């Protein structure tokens, strides 16, 4: 009898053990849903006591993808180019896009005293991106190609320097960088704190000023094993997207409080307002823009010799279930 009771107790304990959901994100306002949701505990409330959420912050996309490969995270907010690179490297086994998160929110910022007025002035300059192969890195290299510029490693004279966003600001202030292609709020910080100006708002390069800068992706294994958890997370993601869009002043205040926790100080209000003016939260993954950025990454040599087949990259089934339940238009 004692043995039976012990076995039963173990079974009950096993049933009560919470599912752990490890979520990646960046301390950027282009990851607004993660910042607001983490600050107010909305994901934890929606998922309930049966799910334990663990948050993991990254500087740029490739690091988040490596964590996904290493089974260190289950789901992450991340840019389109690392998403595609991860899908390609894993032969479609490690990545599924389940929603969009943000559109816009990236700019090419130049130092006011760097002598840059047009594209040809970038010859011989030092230009930073957050990380080799990340979304802004690919965008810069593609723009350079379109304007007759080449990086040093490809026989040109533009020095492209992959360096973290905080270090970009430091080097800007020291006059050791001429420009940077950066996501928000770092682009706005380079303007307001680093003596820079926006040379190019990336939205101007895209149809209808719409391009995906942040996706929500998941491990296919976690999606298969825990579809209920993923759907609940998506429902909250959609609700946060709608709330942020309709309550921008309050949302910016919450994001700033969370950014203070992440980066040790809040953003000045003018920086936050400027940064938010160049982006839009959305749960639409804007698939067409990802396909174009994939072509750009392929052209820049980040995806090998064979262009990847992305037919299995998206799984919007649960997102569209949530949208139908909310009587909202499904996305494609």
Q: Which residues does each predicted region cover?
A:
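Pocket-lining segment of extracytoplasmic ligand-binding domains
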Residues: 91, 114, 154-157, 161, ...
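Short, low-complexity disordered leader/linker segments with a strong preference
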Residues: 1-20, 328-332
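Secondary-structure end/capping motifs
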Residues: 224-305
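Short, glycine-/small- and polar/acidic-enriched structural segments
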Residues: 16-162, 174, 178-184, 199
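Conserved C-terminal helix/tail region of periplasmic/extracytoplasmic solute-binding proteins
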Residues: 295-332
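Short, solvent-exposed loop/beta-turn-alpha elements that line the ligand-binding surface or hinge
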Residues: 41-51, 204-207, 276-285
